[in-house]
Amino acid sequence: MAAVDSRGEVLDVQALPLPYFLLRARVAAMEPAQPGQFVMVAGADRSEPYLRRAFSVYDQEPASDGSLVISLLGKVIGRGTEALAACVPGERIPVLGPLGTGFHSVADDASKSGRAALVAGGIGSAGLGLLAQALERARRSFDFFYGGRSAEDLVEAETFRRLSERTGGRLVRTTEDGSAGERGLITTPLEEGLRAGAGYTTVFTCGPHGLMAAVARIAAAGGVAGEAATETPMGCGYGACLGCAVTLKNGGYALCCRQGPVFRLDEVAW
């Protein structure tokens, strides 16, 4: 699947609990993304910041005119994300994608059995949106573990509740301040579920590095395979800048934008 550099028309920007936002754009030439793939985007004013920002394709829908409507779930952190959150309908923004390698276990027919656990930390839920939809279409049951510092960090929680419940699964929430779900870290109910024989055959995760490292440890202890959609600073999105290296257990490196962003849990040196 070849990436295409084009201009996307902003359809709307939905304000979520600060500092989160959901941007929808119509892209004429882009092919549908696979779960876990991403795009490089920037605001309508390209004068500053110069570099684009990497965003997971959170949702997508083919339009009747042959274009693709993509949804990007974001968090305002700096000037780049601030510019995207400030976009207005009708503005045209640069979009390069789809990029990277998605979740392997979704494409592998041999892995489409058994229950799955999806584990997200905060805005990491954006990297699991298409995956949750793919699992639902495959009629594969999954539980969605969603953790954050506070209730405001569990954006789109109801979307993941609906998707998981349609498969016979459930949404599990934790927050560090106890404002939503149980107080604590989301890795605690995941570990308890594995010990209690929840029957997970695959674990998928996206979020802060510490969360994914903990999920990798828990999955290994439970003898369960898994994959992580990693996040690193990224300058170009296609391997030219070499700025998004991920350290592997074999002592080598892989580029998050090319070989990733999805890696097996057991191949990354967390």
Where are these regions (language model features)?
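FNR/FR-type flavoprotein reductase catalytic core
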Residues: 79-228, 233
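Local cysteine-cluster metal-coordination motifs and their immediate loop/turn environment
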Residues: 127, 209-210, 232-262
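Structural signal for conserved beta-strand scaffold positions within catalytic alpha/beta enzyme cores
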Residues: 12, 59, 173-175, 228, ...
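Short, surface-exposed secondary-structure boundary micro-motifs
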Residues: 44-46, 98, 249
